[in-house]
Amino acid sequence: QIPIAVSPFVAKDPSDRLLAETLLDVVMADLRRTGAFSLLPVGPQNPPLSDATTVNTTLFAQWRAQAADALVMGSISRSPDNQMEVRFRLLDTLRSEDLGGLALSSPVTMLDVRRSGHRIADYIYERLTGEPGFFSTRLAYVRREGANHVLTIADSDGENAQPALRSSQPIISLAWSPNGQHLAYVSFETGKPVVYVHELATGKRTVAANQRGSNSAPAWSPDGKTLAVVLTKDGVSQIYTVNPDGSNLRRLTRSSAINTEPSFSGDGEFVYFTSDQGGSPQVYRVRSDGSGSPERITFTGGFNARPVVSPDGRQLAFVARRDGNFVVCIMNLETRQEVVVSNGPKDDSPSFAPNSRWVIFSSRVGNRDLLSAASIDGRVRSRISLDAAGIRNPAWGKLP
């Protein structure tokens, strides 16, 4: 863990003190949940610091003496046109280096304060770990609201949850487009499963697959030009590819086995999927152009399903049955080594963060369905705070 001190943000107008406190809370909560940082207390003996504080050898030495490898300091103020101005700086106290910062301008709202906090945390995370942050991303999931199923979009910490679609019938299998502007999903609103592509900014929906029988499990290709879907129009479940507007339907798998739950590889060359062709549900892959024969990927245990490939193409998340529990596993696709990253007993629907270092998944806790997250090495596991229970089918959005 990296020892880091985050000094309270200075509110240049006392009336903005609550905004400054919220900004600090968001930044610290984001950093804390990664497990990569040790957040050091900033006691009253330390004078207030802001982006305007003079940076010199004395300041670096002061914070090194308090065991801080990094220091964050910033301020919040109002511009003449009543915009909120947030500024911060990040210091590497070990190397006595100024690592820069951001100057953010936005309307004066609590929502925008939270967004600024996420952007600050993204900057800190990337500069200190070398990996892109993921705090400014969005989550999609389905929650129960009485008799309704509500497709919901929220910030990465579960805050600012907004409904995108309400239906009396189930909504499942959410998948973000690579550009983050669309969601593909399956809706039962017509009395059968149909694949839709939903433009989030406008609410416009396009039918991507409504063939005879079942239409399910959409997955985007990395270039966003193609969806892999599962259809039963010719009998047992098979995988097809189709354009997001429903054109250019093409069959990908051909067997008497059930083939389902596709996920494209990071380079788009392969489609990973679940099949029972060997007698039990296992993960296979096939070339996305349909050439060659399927290759089996998982061999541990009698149930491995719901594969999803990380954005960088290096990891595979899937649901496995281990000792009677359903847990989320991560496989390194180069070494084929596996690690269990969840506790069970009923974990499902893994989805990678856009930096490929985290997964989100649904968990059954007692009689409640909640969202959980874990690092890909399984060392850090957490619940995502949400106001509602009955939450399923999470999907982690792309970087903005």
What is the meaning of each model-derived region?
Residues 2-59, 72-76:
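Short beta-strand->alpha-helix linker/helix-N-cap micro-motif
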Residues 53-123:
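Amphipathic beta-strand/beta-sheet edge segments enriched in Tyr/Trp
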Residues 73, 139-142, 182-186, 226-230, ...:
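Residue position within the beta-strands of beta-propeller blades
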Residues 83-85, 147-152, 192-196, 236-240, ...:
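Structural motif
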Residues 131-137, 173-182, 217-226, 262-270, ...:
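Blade-terminus and WD-like Trp-Asp/Gly-His loop motifs, strongest in beta-propeller folds
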Residues 155-172, 198-216, 242-258, 286-303, ...:
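Multi-bladed beta-propeller domains
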